[in-house]
Curated annotation (Swiss-Prot):
Binding-site residues for ATP, renumbered to this chain: 11, 59, 87, 93, 104, 114
Keyword Cell inner membrane attached: no
Residues annotated as the enzyme's active site: 117
Subcellular location: Cytoplasm
Gene Ontology cellular component list: cytoplasm
Record-given protein name: Nucleoside diphosphate kinase
EC number in record: 2.7.4.6
Source species: Rickettsia prowazekii (strain Madrid E)
Phylogenetic lineage: Bacteria, Pseudomonadati, Pseudomonadota, Alphaproteobacteria, Rickettsiales
GO biological process: CTP biosynthetic process; GTP biosynthetic process; UTP biosynthetic process
Subunit structure, as described in the record: Homotetramer.
Length: 140
């Protein structure tokens, strides 16, 4: 097993329903340590840059509009195989297809408002963490 860092973004639907603590409980109970966390409103430019890999997809504009519709919570998570572990506890992208006991099954409202984003690879994790956090913001 390898200790890894991964990125997580709690989406506006969770913040609006005051469920941040509940999401953090899922993450911590799964064995992930929150080593950085901050709340902010993403600008349209930040959202477009962050989701640039989806720019050509039909859902890009609605994704940017949704993710900028309210505050998000940005996180750096640490743990053994943190990327896979986070993806597992998040559940399938579509809450209707997610397994019972996952964040998206229990809290997700739709494919877009599915409560949480998590890095899907080591390269993505590095890029996404660097996009939002300086090294000094990550507390061991």
């Amino acid at each position: 097993m390898t200790i890894q860092y991964t990125f997580s973004m709690i989406k506006p639907d969770v913040i609006k329903r005051n469920k941040i603590g509940q999401v953090n409980t899922y993450l911590e109970n799964a064995g992930l340590k929150i080593v950085a966390q901050k709340m902010k409103f993403l600008t349209k430019y930040e959202a477009e840059c962050f989701y640039d890999e989806h720019r050509a997809r039909s859902f890009f504009n609605s994704l940017v509009e949704y993710i900028t519709s309210g505050a998000v919570v940005l996180q750096v998570l640490k743990g053994e195989d943190a990327i896979t572990l986070n993806r597992t506890i998040m559940g399938a992208t579509n809450p209707a297809e997610a397994k019972e006991g996952t964040i998206r099954k229990d809290l997700g409202e739709s494919i877009e408002a599915n409560s949480i984003h998590g890095s899907d690879s080591e390269n993505s994790a590095k890029r996404e963490i660097k996009f939002f956090f300086s090294k000094s913001e990550i507390i061991e």
